[in-house]
């Protein structure tokens, strides 16, 4: 049966508004001619003796594990997890401990592009969307959340765009066996700017990072800065998203791909 692969990741790129200013990735590109002198010196030859005076193209990067499309480990959210499953919980898994079984499963897309920036998705919203698409969640399905932020990637207001998943909505997914989710916004939660405004207006500090904090109750992982989710059907596809195995890290860069059987 033929299949179609859809890249649902963004490229690591410097010079665009992909993150807050203090978190932007830096990439230095060295071309074939720039690296030739060092190789020629090491080998004891002249640059002219290398084919066309060239050696290798190389990049130097200064990035966080949370730049680009990446997967957060439970350890990113809180130092312990699974308090709802066992007394006292247990140490949170790092990215090199996330079960590979979580990362290659059938996918489900929730379309929340109509919600305004800063809106916090509720369990009722999730139920209504599942009813609309005619889908019943199954354990280990990968739930992808399509927001208005996806179309803003690289624009100045990207970080402040799109809705976010509240703690209750996240728990709704986890209690049904979901262990990996993803979103095309900068964060799984609502933008920090709108959360800050709500707290300043008298809101509760528990709003801070509430979706992430669900991982303290039931350990899970989510992907952030996904892309092209509007190209996916509501269900009937698979997601492959293995994170880079960074030792004891809170996250790992991920090349996420959706597979549609046609």
Language-model segment annotations:
Residues 1-262:
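Active-/binding-site microenvironments in catalytic and ligand-binding cores
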């Amino acid at each position: 049966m033929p299949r179609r692969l859809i890249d649902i990741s963004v490229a690591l790129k410097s010079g665009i508004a992909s993150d807050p200013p203090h978190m932007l990735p830096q990439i230095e590109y060295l071309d074939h001619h720039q690296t030739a002198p060092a190789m020629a010196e090491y080998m004891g030859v002249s640059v002219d003796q290398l084919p066309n005076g060239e050696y290798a193209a190389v990049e130097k990067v200064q990035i966080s594990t949370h730049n680009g499309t990446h997967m957060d480990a439970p350890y990113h959210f809180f130092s312990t997890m699974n308090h709802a499953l066992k007394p006292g919980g247990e140490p949170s898994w790092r990215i090199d401990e996330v079960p590979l079984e979580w990362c290659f499963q059938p996918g489900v897309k929730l379309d929340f592009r109509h919600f305004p920036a800063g809106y916090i998705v509720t369990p009722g919203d999730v139920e209504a969307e599942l009813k609309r698409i005619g889908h019943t969640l199954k354990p280990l399905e990968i739930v992808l959340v399509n927001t208005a932020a996806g179309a803003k990637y690289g624009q100045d207001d990207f970080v402040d765009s799109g809705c976010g998943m509240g703690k209750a909505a996240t728990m709704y997914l986890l209690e049904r066996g979901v262990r990996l989710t993803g979103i095309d916004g900068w964060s799984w939660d609502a933008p920090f700017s709108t959360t800050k405004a709500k707290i300043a207006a008298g809101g509760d500090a528990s709003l801070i990072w509430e979706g992430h904090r669900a991982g303290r109750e039931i350990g899970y992982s989510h992907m952030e800065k996904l892309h092209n989710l509007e190209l996916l059907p509501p269900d009937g596809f698979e997601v492959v998203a293995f994170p880079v195995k960074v030792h004891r890290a809170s996250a790992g860069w991920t090349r996420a791909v959706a597979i549609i059987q046609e």
